[in-house]
Amino acid sequence: MRKIALFLSLCVFIWASDLQQALEYEKQGDYKKAMEIYKKLALKNSSVLISQEQNNSSQATQTQNSITIKKEEKQDFSRLALANYLGENESFNPLGISSYKMNYFLPFAYSFNSLGVNNNKSEAKFQLSVKKRLFENLLGLDEKYYIAYTQTSWWQIYEHSSPFRETNYQPEFFIDLPLYLKDYEFFNNLRVGILHESNGKGDENLQSRSWNRIYVSTAILYNKFLFVPRLWYRIPENKKDDDNPAILHYMGNFDVNLAYLGDDYFINLMLRNNLKFHNNKGAIQVDLGYDIFNNGIYWYLQYFNGYGESLIDYNKHLQRLSTGFL
């Protein structure tokens, strides 16, 4: 800015000197030389005006580009939310590990039902979920092979010793097969996997919980609506080794997720049911996320009502409201 002011001052000084000289020529009657100086001044003035106009145009273009970049960044956050929801966030990292399911920390998780003796109804809940691609296209179908790990914990942080009340571990292997259906482009993929889930407690105090499933799921995307149905088959166990023989009665054989994905927010509804008219059991979960500061960190609200939020409580009805961020 100082350079521009100095340049303009110099131009004004030069123009004033030239103008004074032209006036002197006029007084002497030499109009030809006076007109030549006037022409030079006019050309200098027009070049400065053109330069100023170009500068203003350049600034306007930069401003417009800045606005466009900001809009594109906002759109990128929307695509990031969708990729994270589908488990397709392949951000570069040396180990090739990326996010799988939602990763969140909810420091305020309140249960409207008892969590057992000596347990506080208020606790924290968090989930870590990652995956790694092993290889791809072995069958020539553009399929991808993954291993994944998800850990969900319920943490009694408001108690004196802050013990972990329950932790569920879910290692799995799955294959993603892209679907290229000309008339059904909203079908994105077909996923087939095997999933183990346990709470790692062994047999002490009859609190051990575990089961194994084979599942198939798909993702159906229409505009900003995402529908993800999943069906599973429980791999049978010996009655003597089965920690939770009635788990299918409470968890059923399927769940569905229906989500709306906005530019800076999402709403998701999860439904699960055993489809029994007599002694019906199931669960509903509502998730709401909002990117408050437009930086990819979402404020997150979660409501759960039903059975099977955790393995230790799979046969207990719980209603819980939790909030935090993801």
List each model region and its residues:
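N-terminal regions that are enriched for targeting/export leaders
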Residues: 52-112
